[in-house]
């Protein structure tokens, strides 16, 4: 419990090694690899609790999260730390300190209003912006289409689960000589979003990678039609890299499981009131 509280209050981060050799890139647009235990068993435990929350009515979810949904200003915190004064998301001719893509649903918890679903057996979709690997689209590589002389490439990831996010991180570890992954205290600890900060570009690897990407997309420039699910590598990355990524993401998912368990207990408490012991623990932990 102390470690979870520390993780939430202080955030967590990791630095990945640089790999001079790109893995075997094989872009396919339209579908993402399916979840598997190889890429994080903790996710499946986490998903059971997410499904419990997912079936509750969204008006109740809004009521119980209204006070604990902090403003997600983790990107701004990163800008301050790195002394970044100007950012851009598009426009190769525009000059900035960093090119930034935010794939998260900022300050949002669910996708649409919904009534109670009587059991998990009737769940047909994930209505929450939590643990949804389908939210990661090929736009995660859009910065490479937009970069010119920017020092940093920054990506707000919508999730930490699945093969695709690990493969993507591994590719970035060959495109940039410094790749760090952050889950900031200023981010929402109801969601599994995180930030990649990449710097010190490796030009030869970027040129090779973009040559392959453009041959598949048949375009020199970014196209909105490419903003779809994707797979990027032919084979799984090495176990050592997967383990290093999971060492980071497991800390996040263990914290989220505890937070979501408190939230679920609060929403289903016998008191039928937002003033209950679980909600008080949540408020103390997140605010």
Swiss-Prot record:
The enzyme's E.C. designation: 2.1.1.56
Reaction catalyzed: a 5'-end (5'-triphosphoguanosine)-ribonucleoside in mRNA + S-adenosyl-L-methionine = a 5'-end (N(7)-methyl 5'-triphosphoguanosine)-ribonucleoside in mRNA + S-adenosyl-L-homocysteine
Cellular component terms per the entry's GO annotation: virion component
Species for this entry: Yaba monkey tumor virus (strain VR587)
Protein name: mRNA-capping enzyme small subunit
Keyword S-adenosyl-L-methionine: yes
Superkingdom of origin organism: Viruses
InterPro entries registered for this protein in UniProt: Poxvirus_mRNA-cap_ssu, Poxvirus_mRNA-cap_ssu_sf
């Amino acid at each position: 419990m102390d470690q979870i509280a520390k993780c939430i209050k202080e955030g967590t981060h990791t630095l990945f090694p640089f790999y001079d050799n790109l893995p075997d890139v094989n872009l396919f647009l339209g579908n993402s690899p399916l979840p598997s235990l190889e890429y994080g068993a903790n996710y499946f435990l986490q998903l059971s609790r997410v499904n419990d929350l997912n079936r509750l009515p969204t008006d109740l979810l809004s009521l119980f999260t209204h006070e604990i949904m902090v403003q997600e200003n983790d990107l701004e915190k990163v800008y301050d730390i790195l002394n970044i004064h100007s950012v851009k998301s598009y426009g190769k001719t525009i000059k900035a300190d960093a090119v930034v893509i935010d794939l998260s649903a900022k300050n949002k918890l669910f996708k649409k209003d919904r009534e109670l679903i009587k059991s998990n057996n009737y769940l047909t979709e994930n209505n929450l912006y939590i643990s949804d690997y389908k939210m990661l689209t090929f736009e995660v590589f859009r910065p490479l289409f937009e970069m010119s002389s920017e020092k940093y490439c920054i990506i707000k990831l919508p999730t930490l689960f699945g093969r695709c996010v690990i493969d993507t991180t591994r590719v970035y570890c060959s495109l940039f000589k410094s790749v760090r992954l952050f889950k900031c205290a200023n981010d929402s600890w109801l969601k599994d979003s995180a930030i990649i900060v990449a710097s010190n570009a490796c030009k030869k690897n970027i040129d090779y990678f973009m040559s392959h990407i453009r041959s598949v997309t048949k375009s020199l420039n970014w196209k909105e039609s490419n903003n779809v699910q994707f797979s990027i590598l032919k084979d799984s990355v090495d176990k050592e890299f997967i383990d290093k990524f999971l060492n980071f993401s497991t800390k996040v998912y263990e914290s989220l499981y505890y937070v979501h368990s408190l939230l679920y207990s609060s929403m289903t408490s016998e008191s039928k009131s937002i003033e209950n012991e679980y909600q008080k623990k949540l408020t103390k932990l997140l605010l």
